[in-house]
Amino acid sequence: MWRQSMITVLSGGTGTPKLLQGLVRVVDPEEITVIVNTVENGYLSGVYVAPDVDTVLYTLAGIINEETWYGVEGDTFITHETLRELGCPELLRIGDRDRAFKIQKTLLLGEMPLHRAVEIQSRALGVESRVLPMSNEDSDIVIVTDEGDMEFHEFLVERRSEPGVLDVRFSRVKPAPGVLDAIESADMVILGPSNPVTSIGPIINMEGVTDSLRKVNVSAVSPFTGGRPFSGPAGKFMEAKGYDASSLGVAEIYADFLDRLVIDETDSDLKGEIEKLIKEVTITKTNMENIGDKIMLARILLGEIL
């Protein structure tokens, strides 16, 4: 039986996992629920791949490859390399241990919904926090580019985010069981520094989520430092949706429900403009280069409820 959450975190597969490493060192991991983006989920070489969910699980289990922020540390790639030799192209480079985990998830999905499969795998990995996929339903994401429509990983991996982005579209799905309750029962909800459009956006656009967020104390960490995203094409995606590619644009996306935005010292010049949208702006170092940075940011976020 999961303990009632003190903190609920909305997460994608980049940025936020680093913050989670700090949070679990500041509060009891059992008091943390992580709601994870699933819009990138799909099948690859016959196995079900849930990139962001697995990254969060591996991070909380202490086995994440911190050089890439996906997959298992020290993994081998014999299966991936053999498949390529056999003429079976794989867009994603999946390690052998990582693949075994995905095979198990695929088998479990033949018997149960995704949130139950994730719960079983979470316990098997010894993860103390509760990890919830945002939805049990499949969601399609399309990156509309100046070269035509592309699947997310086609754009991100095969094309290395190079084409110009005109729009980002994803289907709206229903929250998985427990998602809305995890938000409404939390002392604080944190939107981690993941991509606001393709990672956090699909979560907050699900039915009922924004209404739930309006009822609670919500803080967010901007994924921008000095006008540049921590990683990935967040800037391109935000501009394609009509937002400024900056911490100010993040504030615009979250303005309907956000109580506080934490921004980096390099973005301090935006504080005045952001305060027109968000009632509280905190300026600190948000670039998490080591465990000390991660703990410090976690303490700043949780200061008022610790």
From Swiss-Prot:
InterPro entries: CofD (IPR002882), CofD-like_dom_sf (IPR038136), FbiA/CofD (IPR010115). GO terms for biological process: F420-0 metabolic process. Its EC number is 2.7.8.28. 7,8-didemethyl-8-hydroxy-5-deazariboflavin binds at residues 54, 93. The keyword Translocase does not apply. Keywords: Magnesium, Transferase. Pathway: Cofactor biosynthesis; coenzyme F420 biosynthesis. Homodimer. Belongs to the CofD family. Catalyzes the transfer of the 2-phospholactate moiety from (2S)-lactyl-2-diphospho-5'-guanosine to 7,8-didemethyl-8-hydroxy-5-deazariboflavin (FO) with the formation of oxidized coenzyme F420-0 and GMP. This is 2-phospho-L-lactate transferase. The lineage of its organism: Archaea, Methanobacteriati, Methanobacteriota, Methanomada group, Methanobacteria. The gene is cofD.
